């Protein structure tokens, strides 16, 4: 997939891409005024659309962990940080209020609970990891900030 940013250098054996990283990079690059008009900036919309089509379940809004070069699920685990990055990226999409609200509700219902969050769900949507690693709050905080700016 030449329109997405791969996890390994181009041409590397057994390469893949992670929708969560695509959405994170989309947000960071799309929000940068320094990239406006560049070839990279122009390709962002196509990369977002492809990643959303291949890496997000249209029924549940679940973002899978990894896709192979053809865009098929290589790891269908659903990690909370990827869900948060997708939600944050949606805040920069045109006419996205309904999508943002739908994805926010999915995040709340599937991953958040009174004591914190579920780190991972398996391909069937069952909780597969209950610990709460210290790397996740970064993604939740930046998602929250994006939501505050978007929703006002």
Each model region followed by its residue ranges:
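Glycan-recognition and catalytic cores of secretory/periplasmic carbohydrate-active enzymes
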Residues: 1-152
